[in-house]
Structure formats: C-alpha cells, structure tokens
C-alpha cells in the first residue's frame, strides 16, 4: 500500500505554538504539546519511557499497561498510541496484545520536499516562506489490507471515541475541518484539553499493489521458462 501524504509543517507548529500557551505554563510548552500529540519527542523517544527527557533514545520495545495505563505520559488520543495500542486495549494486557498483533503492519516512510528549516528550528520554520509542498511517501506491507491497514485507519486512527474518548480524532490526520474537535491530555489533578483541532496531513494520492511472495515468483518464473 502506498500513500503520498502532504504535511502542513508550518501550520502544525503555528497551531502548537498558540495552543500550548493555554495548556502548559513553561518555556518548553510548545515541544511538550507537540510530543503529546505525536506520542514521541522529536528525537524519537517515546513519552511512555521518557516522559520528561526530549533527548531519550528512540525505542519501540515497550507497552503501556505497566507504566502508562492512565495515559498521563502518552495520551490515549496521540497518533502513536492510536496506530499501535499495544497492550492498552480492553480485556487486559495479554488479550490486548493478541488483538493488536492481528492488525500490525510493516511500514516505512520517506520525506519529500525541502525542509522549512535546515536546522529544524521551530522559529525559523514559522518565519519561512512556505510555498513548496512537502510531506511523506508512506509505504506499508500487509498480508491482509482490510484486516491490517484499513482496520487501523478506520477503527483506531479515525475513531473519535477511541479508547473511551468522546470527540477526539487523531491529532495529526483525523480531524474534519468542519467539526469542533478536541485533543484530551490526561493529567493530575485534572485533564487538559486542546480545542479547535485542525488537520495537518492530507492524502494526495495512493494505491494498493500486489507483491508476490518469493515462492510465488519462483513458480511464475518456472512457468515462464517451461511455457
């Protein structure tokens, strides 16, 4: 499966800059809110393992139930937690892991278009001339497109009531422009909410392709030679 995803990088950082003033009272508010929406810091470090360390390691070997069952580190509505809930679905960690594994897929992405800032500095990105499209070429491999990619997209990412939420779409790519939606951040003593969410990723195009297995290719090769 291939998709070309156009990303409004400047719009994302402009929204995060303005919204963070109402959510967090700290100089690092902008980076923290961005990480909450994605589920990782810009270094790739997951919030579940590194809730206060933006320079942590980019790791994938973790679950949510033991360290972050209440979502105070990585919000339930974050893009990361939606696209792979791991052990945090209903039914307990073991059952949740079994369910999640049925829908896992191998995915890779390659950016296209020039960066707004060579140093990836947020202030530079906000001041830059944003006249060139940029985004991500997204590819995923599935044994069953309906069970893996389409299920993940429709049931988890686009579901505003995912994991007990009410009107929370995916904070990056799931917010219809004509709806008043929110992003909920569990916190102690009270949760925080970002309102008037926007869509920062648009699908420009895509296609499904059939990739034969190696045994199938060998079979086709033998058939061609003997034909």
Name the predicted role of every residue range.
Residues 1-227:
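Long, histidine/aromatic-enriched segments associated with O2/redox biology
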